[in-house]
């Protein structure tokens, strides 16, 4: 059985950077507001993708790009298999990074982020 090589962690007691996204051999810490904005961006891209998904053929390629500052997202792939590229640039321009989630984990990581954020209510 292959070990899961990604995840999302939340620890509000950690202070400023209380969210952690882990993929393979890297991780990134996010502030609560950054994570909230990421969640909102992912919901937006999911809604747009869902609205056109039913019209796609199984092997038809799709590319969606959405910018909701400080995030930029690009979904690329097919109806049921897609990857996701995310770019973050802080409003203060003090830090920036790019994340790439390949096809095997993009969808799963998206739902983990959604689950973690929605569990905070």
Describe the role of every protein-language-model region.
Residues 1-121:
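Positively charged, low-complexity terminal tracts
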């Amino acid at each position: 059985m292959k070990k899961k090589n990604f995840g999302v962690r939340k620890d509000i007691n950690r202070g400023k950077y209380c969210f952690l996204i882990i993929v393979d051999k890297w991780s990134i810490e996010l502030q609560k507001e950054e994570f909230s904005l990421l969640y909102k961006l992912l919901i937006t891209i999911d809604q747009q993708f869902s609205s056109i998904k039913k019209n796609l053929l199984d092997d038809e390629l799709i590319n969606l790009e959405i910018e909701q500052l400080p995030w930029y997202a690009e979904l690329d792939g097919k109806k049921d298999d897609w990857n996701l590229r995310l770019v973050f640039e802080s409003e203060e321009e003090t830090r920036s990074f790019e994340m790439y989630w390949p096809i095997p984990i993009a969808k799963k990581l998206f739902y983990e982020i959604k689950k973690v954020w929605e569990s905070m209510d």
